[in-house]
Amino acid sequence: MSYAVFTMFKTAPDYRDEAISIINQLKEITLANGATGARIGMLGSGNNVGKLVVFQFFKNMGDIESAYDALLKSPLLKKAQESGKFSILYREVQKVIYDFGTHLSAQAKYVVLTIGTADDPALDTISKFADVLTSNGAISGRYGPITIGDKADGRTFL
């Protein structure tokens, strides 16, 4: 079992470059304190076009706690928040129950997020869908319920 954390940030246009620099430094802090991987990007579609996002991956909840304890000690996060031009809009924690592909970060250019609801995880259906994705160029994927955050209702999957 592993976990993924998805965080969305709002930044003022004139602060975007500074925010990206700070987020990259925060990424290194999480990697040094328990994260097994991290990706930074910008949403290109949907209701939040232009928002910065970070995906972090962890082996267990204890590693999430260690990474976030280290982030709270960093003056970088405080600096960004005190600027008034940077804020965290949204954070969800996903329990990964199905993981597929190679996760080769150098090859990935895009990430596709799909959020859906179901009464059960439907792992057989997801497994078949993962085969379709990888046979058509997908490098990797993770699937599971959102366990912490606004959509943690036991029926919402990412």
Where are these regions (language model features)?
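Short S/T/G/P-rich N-terminal loop/turn motif that feeds into the first structured element of a domain
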Residues: 1-158
